[in-house]
Protein backbone atom coordinates (compact mmCIF):
# COMPACT_ATOMS: atom_id res chain seq x y z
CA UNK A 1 0.00 0.00 0.00
CA UNK A 2 1.14 3.55 -0.56
CA UNK A 3 1.64 4.42 3.09
CA UNK A 4 0.08 1.77 5.29
CA UNK A 5 0.42 3.21 8.77
CA UNK A 6 -0.61 1.87 12.14
CA UNK A 7 -0.93 3.21 15.67
CA UNK A 8 1.27 1.58 18.28
CA UNK A 9 -1.56 -0.71 19.34
CA UNK A 10 -4.29 -1.27 16.71
CA UNK A 11 -5.68 -4.40 18.40
CA UNK A 12 -7.26 -6.25 15.50
CA UNK A 13 -7.69 -4.84 12.03
CA UNK A 14 -9.31 -5.61 8.70
CA UNK A 15 -9.22 -4.27 5.17
CA UNK A 16 -11.28 -5.02 2.06
CA UNK A 17 -10.31 -3.76 -1.36
CA UNK A 18 -8.82 -4.21 -4.82
CA UNK A 19 -5.18 -3.79 -5.65
CA UNK A 20 -3.73 -1.61 -8.39
CA UNK A 21 -4.51 -4.32 -10.97
CA UNK A 22 -8.09 -4.72 -9.76
CA UNK A 23 -7.55 -8.00 -7.87
CA UNK A 24 -10.00 -8.23 -4.93
CA UNK A 25 -8.70 -9.16 -1.48
CA UNK A 26 -9.26 -8.90 2.22
CA UNK A 27 -6.66 -8.64 4.98
CA UNK A 28 -6.97 -9.40 8.68
CA UNK A 29 -4.42 -8.89 11.43
CA UNK A 30 -3.86 -9.51 15.13
CA UNK A 31 -1.78 -7.73 17.73
CA UNK A 32 -1.64 -8.44 21.44
CA UNK A 33 -0.31 -7.18 24.76
CA UNK A 34 -0.84 -10.20 27.01
CA UNK A 35 0.64 -13.70 26.64
CA UNK A 36 -2.89 -15.00 25.94
CA UNK A 37 -3.42 -12.51 23.12
CA UNK A 38 0.00 -13.23 21.66
CA UNK A 39 -0.54 -17.01 21.78
CA UNK A 40 -2.76 -17.09 18.70
CA UNK A 41 -2.52 -18.04 15.05
CA UNK A 42 -4.56 -17.49 11.90
CA UNK A 43 -5.65 -20.75 10.27
CA UNK A 44 -6.94 -20.58 6.68
CA UNK A 45 -9.38 -23.27 5.56
CA UNK A 46 -11.17 -23.49 2.20
CA UNK A 47 -14.00 -21.19 3.25
CA UNK A 48 -13.10 -20.11 6.76
CA UNK A 49 -10.44 -18.11 8.56
CA UNK A 50 -10.00 -19.18 12.19
CA UNK A 51 -8.25 -17.40 15.06
CA UNK A 52 -6.89 -20.27 17.14
CA UNK A 53 -5.12 -20.56 20.49
CA UNK A 54 -1.57 -21.90 20.43
CA UNK A 55 -0.98 -22.19 24.18
CA UNK A 56 -3.17 -25.18 24.98
CA UNK A 57 -5.20 -23.06 27.38
CA UNK A 58 -8.98 -22.63 27.55
CA UNK A 59 -10.94 -21.24 24.61
CA UNK A 60 -11.93 -17.60 25.03
CA UNK A 61 -14.62 -16.33 22.64
CA UNK A 62 -13.10 -12.84 22.71
CA UNK A 63 -9.76 -14.17 21.46
CA UNK A 64 -10.60 -17.35 19.54
CA UNK A 65 -13.29 -17.33 16.85
CA UNK A 66 -14.12 -17.67 13.17
CA UNK A 67 -12.82 -14.45 11.60
CA UNK A 68 -14.08 -14.99 8.03
CA UNK A 69 -16.54 -17.13 6.10
CA UNK A 70 -17.05 -17.52 2.37
CA UNK A 71 -20.12 -18.37 0.30
CA UNK A 72 -20.33 -18.86 -3.45
CA UNK A 73 -20.50 -15.11 -4.10
CA UNK A 74 -19.95 -13.38 -0.75
CA UNK A 75 -17.75 -13.22 2.33
CA UNK A 76 -18.05 -11.94 5.90
CA UNK A 77 -15.02 -10.84 7.92
CA UNK A 78 -14.74 -9.66 11.51
CA UNK A 79 -13.11 -9.80 14.91
CA UNK A 80 -15.40 -12.11 16.85
CA UNK A 81 -18.36 -14.41 17.18
CA UNK A 82 -20.54 -12.02 15.19
CA UNK A 83 -19.04 -13.51 12.01
CA UNK A 84 -20.58 -16.93 12.67
CA UNK A 85 -23.86 -15.32 13.76
CA UNK A 86 -24.10 -13.11 10.66
CA UNK A 87 -23.21 -16.05 8.43
CA UNK A 88 -26.02 -18.13 9.95
CA UNK A 89 -28.60 -15.41 9.26
CA UNK A 90 -27.29 -14.08 5.95
CA UNK A 91 -29.85 -15.93 3.81
CA UNK A 92 -32.70 -14.11 5.53
CA UNK A 93 -30.86 -10.90 6.54
CA UNK A 94 -28.33 -10.12 3.78
CA UNK A 95 -28.11 -6.37 4.52
CA UNK A 96 -25.07 -6.10 6.78
CA UNK A 97 -25.69 -2.47 7.68
CA UNK A 98 -29.04 -3.45 9.18
CA UNK A 99 -27.61 -6.59 10.76
CA UNK A 100 -24.84 -4.59 12.44
CA UNK A 101 -27.44 -2.66 14.39
CA UNK A 102 -28.24 -5.82 16.34
CA UNK A 103 -24.67 -6.01 17.63
CA UNK A 104 -23.03 -4.34 20.58
CA UNK A 105 -19.40 -3.95 21.61
CA UNK A 106 -17.45 -6.72 23.31
CA UNK A 107 -18.17 -7.37 27.01
CA UNK A 108 -14.70 -6.36 28.23
CA UNK A 109 -15.18 -3.25 30.40
CA UNK A 110 -13.70 -0.75 30.81
CA UNK A 111 -12.25 -1.00 27.27
CA UNK A 112 -15.46 -1.97 25.46
CA UNK A 113 -13.69 -3.22 22.35
CA UNK A 114 -15.59 -2.52 19.11
CA UNK A 115 -16.85 -5.41 17.02
CA UNK A 116 -15.51 -4.66 13.54
CA UNK A 117 -17.11 -6.37 10.54
CA UNK A 118 -16.95 -6.31 6.74
CA UNK A 119 -18.84 -8.00 3.92
CA UNK A 120 -19.08 -7.85 0.14
CA UNK A 121 -20.61 -9.58 -2.85
CA UNK A 122 -18.10 -11.17 -5.23
CA UNK A 123 -18.53 -10.97 -9.01
CA UNK A 124 -15.36 -12.14 -10.78
CA UNK A 125 -12.82 -9.46 -9.86
CA UNK A 126 -15.46 -6.99 -8.66
CA UNK A 127 -16.40 -6.25 -5.06
CA UNK A 128 -19.95 -4.90 -4.82
CA UNK A 129 -22.34 -4.05 -1.99
CA UNK A 130 -19.34 -3.55 0.27
CA UNK A 131 -20.04 -2.76 3.93
CA UNK A 132 -17.39 -2.06 6.56
CA UNK A 133 -18.53 -1.02 10.01
CA UNK A 134 -18.53 -1.62 13.73
CA UNK A 135 -20.51 -1.74 16.93
CA UNK A 136 -18.76 0.55 19.43
CA UNK A 137 -19.53 2.29 22.69
CA UNK A 138 -21.03 5.75 22.25
CA UNK A 139 -18.56 8.36 23.47
CA UNK A 140 -20.55 10.24 26.07
CA UNK A 141 -22.74 7.35 27.18
CA UNK A 142 -20.87 4.03 26.98
CA UNK A 143 -23.97 2.05 27.89
CA UNK A 144 -25.20 2.95 24.39
CA UNK A 145 -23.89 1.49 21.12
CA UNK A 146 -23.19 3.38 17.90
CA UNK A 147 -22.70 1.75 14.50
CA UNK A 148 -20.44 3.75 12.16
CA UNK A 149 -20.29 2.11 8.75
CA UNK A 150 -19.45 2.72 5.10
CA UNK A 151 -21.35 1.30 2.12
CA UNK A 152 -19.82 1.21 -1.35
CA UNK A 153 -21.79 -0.05 -4.33
CA UNK A 154 -18.43 -0.94 -5.89
CA UNK A 155 -14.79 -0.69 -4.88
CA UNK A 156 -12.56 0.78 -7.58
CA UNK A 157 -9.13 -0.68 -8.34
CA UNK A 158 -6.39 0.71 -6.12
CA UNK A 159 -8.73 1.27 -3.16
CA UNK A 160 -9.43 -0.41 0.17
CA UNK A 161 -11.61 0.26 3.19
CA UNK A 162 -10.05 -0.50 6.56
CA UNK A 163 -10.63 -0.21 10.29
CA UNK A 164 -9.07 -1.36 13.56
CA UNK A 165 -10.42 -1.96 17.03
CA UNK A 166 -8.00 0.50 18.67
CA UNK A 167 -5.93 3.51 17.64
CA UNK A 168 -3.92 4.39 20.74
CA UNK A 169 -0.91 2.98 22.55
CA UNK A 170 -0.46 -0.22 24.52
CA UNK A 171 -0.68 1.72 27.78
CA UNK A 172 -3.39 4.19 26.75
CA UNK A 173 -5.91 2.27 24.65
CA UNK A 174 -8.30 4.30 22.52
CA UNK A 175 -11.12 2.50 20.74
CA UNK A 176 -11.63 2.97 17.01
CA UNK A 177 -13.97 1.01 14.74
CA UNK A 178 -14.42 3.86 12.27
CA UNK A 179 -13.85 2.82 8.62
CA UNK A 180 -11.55 4.83 6.36
CA UNK A 181 -10.46 4.46 2.74
CA UNK A 182 -6.82 4.04 1.72
CA UNK A 183 -4.98 3.87 -1.59
CA UNK A 184 -3.53 0.55 -2.74
CA UNK A 185 -0.69 1.18 -5.16
CA UNK A 186 0.77 -2.32 -5.33
CA UNK A 187 -0.14 -5.99 -5.70
CA UNK A 188 -2.46 -7.68 -3.22
CA UNK A 189 0.37 -10.16 -2.56
CA UNK A 190 2.47 -7.41 -0.93
CA UNK A 191 -0.28 -6.17 1.39
CA UNK A 192 0.63 -8.63 4.17
CA UNK A 193 4.23 -7.44 4.22
CA UNK A 194 3.14 -3.80 4.24
CA UNK A 195 0.80 -4.32 7.18
CA UNK A 196 3.31 -6.47 9.08
CA UNK A 197 6.02 -3.83 8.68
CA UNK A 198 3.68 -1.15 10.03
CA UNK A 199 2.96 -3.03 13.28
CA UNK A 200 4.97 -2.64 16.48
CA UNK A 201 7.32 -5.67 16.57
CA UNK A 202 6.71 -6.46 20.25
CA UNK A 203 2.92 -6.46 19.75
CA UNK A 204 2.35 -7.97 16.32
CA UNK A 205 0.97 -11.53 16.19
CA UNK A 206 -0.24 -12.44 12.68
CA UNK A 207 -1.43 -11.03 9.34
CA UNK A 208 -3.18 -12.74 6.44
CA UNK A 209 -4.24 -11.43 3.04
CA UNK A 210 -6.67 -13.53 0.98
CA UNK A 211 -7.24 -13.17 -2.75
CA UNK A 212 -10.98 -13.22 -3.45
CA UNK A 213 -11.36 -14.00 -7.17
CA UNK A 214 -11.07 -17.70 -6.37
CA UNK A 215 -13.81 -20.13 -5.33
CA UNK A 216 -12.09 -20.79 -1.99
CA UNK A 217 -9.47 -19.17 0.25
CA UNK A 218 -6.71 -20.85 -1.76
CA UNK A 219 -4.38 -17.96 -2.58
CA UNK A 220 -3.13 -16.31 0.61
CA UNK A 221 -0.13 -14.49 2.03
CA UNK A 222 0.67 -14.72 5.74
CA UNK A 223 3.08 -13.37 8.32
CA UNK A 224 3.38 -14.41 11.97
CA UNK A 225 5.62 -13.97 15.00
Which ranges hold each PLM region?
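Conserved short alpha-helical segments that host acidic/polar catalytic motifs at enzyme active sites
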Residues: 1-225
